[in-house]
Amino acid sequence: MYCSTCLFFIYALLCIAYDLRSHSVPLIVHLLFVLPGLIVFGSQLHGALQACVLTTHQVISDTPAEASSAALPLWHPIWTALLPLLPGLLALLISRLSREALGLGDGLFLLIAGLYLQMRSMLLLLLSGILVGFLVSAVLLIHGHIHGRSMRKVCFPWIPCTLPALCAIAFSQFPLL
């Protein structure tokens, strides 16, 4: 678990560094971290499938009254494993539909993060990025208004806006002694 978390933080810090320096993340950085992410995701999906098999076995072996009182649907573990990929897939769709107003690299970052993180951490990452991005946009807009410049075509790197969430995730994964 710690190994996959460390891999994700290395990936995130590399993306932040490249995004700050050149406003883009090289595709090779994304590709280097996809395979380990798929391995982590595969192990999570394997655990979810095992939980489904166990639940199915319990439902089959129990009496009908006990089987109907199951708390969670059979597909719940699989849905829980797949759900963290949704923000990245939506970001890639928005990137495509908006002709990359939202960068392709940002969507890839969220999709690859979904391979490593659970849904709660993904939501924190996404909401942090949106909130900090809003604050940066507001500051840029006010700065442009004060100096009489149009800020209509100004863009800024979004991945560094996720840094507060990355810090929170790091502190939750690696508690201080």
Q: PLM features: residue spans?
A:
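A membrane-topology feature that recognizes alpha-helical transmembrane segments
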Residues: 1-177
